[in-house]
Amino acid sequence: MRPEGSLTYWVPERLRQGFCGVGRAAQALVCASAKEGTAFRMEAVQEGAAGVESEQAALGEEAVLLLDDIMAEVEVVAEEEGLVERREEAQRAQQAVPGPGPMTPESALEELLAVQVELEPVNAQARKAFSRQREKMERRRKPHLDRRGAVIQSVPGFWANVIANHPQMSALITDEDEDMLSYMVSLEVEEEKHPVHLCKIMLFFRSNPYFQNKVITKEYLVNITEYRASHSTPIEWYLDYEVEAYRRRHHNSSLNFFNWFSDHNFAGSNKIAEILCKDLWRNPLQYYKRMKPPEEGTETSGDSQLLS
């Protein structure tokens, strides 16, 4: 019979079998007791190779996520126990003071300090839970993003089409920009939350007559109100285009895609970064325009109708 106040977790039989691929089956028991603190015990026994290999990776990932949840629950229980103990100590201290009286400013500040002390572990617990949940969701999103990227590789000019058809971006793109974007083969966005919130935009290009770079990376520090330029890969223009690039950058001082692309600190360029990170990257397909195939018996022309 388990002690009162304890939490016991058993790894399901299906997950234990999932570890056969590495030669071990794991059975996890986590027990958090209000009297004896938190204890975590992992018992592993050697088992022979069994199961279907194609399921092992998925089972292993599921086991990792389950153990993450278990550890998160253990931390929550431990922190709650500590908070209960601190509250009980504060109550005993208050009971030791003879006679309740009107609260003076000094006593009010002491009470406020005690409440703030109690609040700190709750805030820390919330931050840990949020961070762990975000990391878990990122792990689950990654295989889908990888698959999406592989599929997009089979659609020529996908990202150029998407960027040019975005309602805000379309006003910032010239014909020369569209030609440059036609050499773009992939777009990737990565976000880091710690130690600072950072958004990294990576644009991948095939060989083109404009610049030598295969990958151009732009990084932005993100806060509540804006995206602030942090770092950008220097563009290695070909000599045949370097003069033209200089002319374009200084001839037009308004915000456009080329100025954002070539000058990381160009005024207002953070707006383009925000569109790429928060809108285009999350659902690019909504801005992709497909060419409508001609109907049978009709003559084809250069002006094909677009499908949203």
Curated annotation (Swiss-Prot):
Highest taxon of source: Eukaryota
Subcellular location: Cytoplasm; Nucleus
One Pfam assignment: NAP
Keywords of this entry: Cytoplasm, Developmental protein, Differentiation, Gonadal differentiation, Nucleus, Spermatogenesis
InterPro entries: NAP-like_sf, NAP_family
GO biological process: cell differentiation; gonadal mesoderm development; nucleosome assembly; spermatogenesis
CC per GO annotation: chromatin; cytoplasm; nucleus
GO molecular function, one term: chromatin binding
Family: Belongs to the nucleosome assembly protein (NAP) family.
Function of the molecule: May be involved in sperm differentiation and proliferation.
Protein name per its UniProtKB record: Testis-specific Y-encoded protein 8
